[in-house]
Regions:
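His/Asp/Glu-enriched short active-site or ligand-binding loop at hydrolase and phosphoryl-transfer sites
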Residues: 140, 146-181, 220-231
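Active-site beta->alpha N-cap acidic-glycine motif
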Residues: 17-103, 109, 116, 120, ...
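Catalytic grooves of carbohydrate-active enzymes
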Residues: 180-229
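Soluble catalytic domains of enzymes that build or remodel membrane lipids, polysaccharides, and related
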Residues: 110-125, 144-148, 175-180
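Charged helix-capping and loop-helix junction motifs
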Residues: 110-114, 170-176, 202-208
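N-terminal signal-anchor transmembrane alpha helix of single-pass membrane proteins
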Residues: 2-18
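Divalent metal-coordination and catalytic microenvironments
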Residues: 44, 59, 92, 134-137, ...
Length: 233
């Protein structure tokens, strides 16, 4: 009985505590966006060779800034796109290197993946920052990675609205627009990796256009994660 309780306690510590942290962080992020009447567009898993430039063009047309959580393995050969993201004033953050689920691999492999993702961004930009705001793949962290990020004071960034672009049954492309308008602010999640299905890429583009149009119409501020959270100030 005591062994079983001990095992359950370890499991709770390993994944339960980070899960609770994630839920609280998500709510605080949503509250901050609503308080500031802000729309924060974030994109995971890029850069894509075609979809990311398309998104950058839309953002440039609207003179809006967004946040890109880059996946290290997708950077090689697309360094010019990473530089373009930075040159246009968007936030560059990390989504790790291999999109590892923090609960399904060893803690040390997950931790190594975080560091490898940062290194890939630095290599593309020719910088030595060594750390960037981090979004856990699938929103999952283990206690080792959580403590490491907290000790190093690395912002851990979640989201409040999922665009649904990776769902098996995609919702209406107005999902982000409608939910963000109803809430009065949001941190949206979409994905800018290249798709085989052009309809999915079109869905992302339409979602971004609609959200930016709504923000302009309602006087909602379009901010980056750094601006929302006052990172680096």
């Amino acid at each position: 009985m005591l062994i079983a309780i001990g095992i359950l306690g370890l499991i709770f510590l390993y994944v339960g505590v980070p899960w609770i942290y994630g839920q609280l962080a998500r709510r605080l992020l949503e509250r901050r966006a609503i308080e500031r009447e802000a729309l924060v567009l974030t994109f995971d898993d890029g850069p894509g060779s075609s979809l990311t430039p398309a998104i950058l063009n839309i953002l440039a047309e609207s003179k809006a800034k967004a946040t890109f959580f880059l996946l290290g393995r997708n950077i090689a050969g697309r360094e010019a796109i990473v530089s373009q993201i930075a040159e246009q004033g968007h936030d560059i953050c990390s989504h790790g290197y291999d999109h590892l689920h923090g609960w399904k691999v060893s803690p040390f492999r997950a931790l190594s993946d975080i560091k490898r993702g940062w290194a890939a961004i630095d290599a593309a930009l020719g910088t030595m920052r060594k750390k960037y705001p981090f979004r856990p793949p699938n929103g999952k962290l283990n206690i080792i990675c959580l403590l490491y990020l907290l000790v190093r004071q690395v912002p851990i960034v979640y989201w409040s609205i999922d665009s649904g672009d990776t769902w098996r049954r995609r919702p209406d492309s107005l999902r982000v627009t409608q939910l963000a308008e109803r809430a009065g602010g949001a941190v949206s999640l979409a994905h800018d990796f290249d798709r085989k299905n052009e309809n999915t890429s079109r869905f992302v583009v339409e979602s971004v256009r609609a959200a930016l149009a709504m923000a302009a119409d309602k006087g909602m501020r379009v901010l980056t994660v750094s601006e929302l959270l006052d990172i680096g100030r």
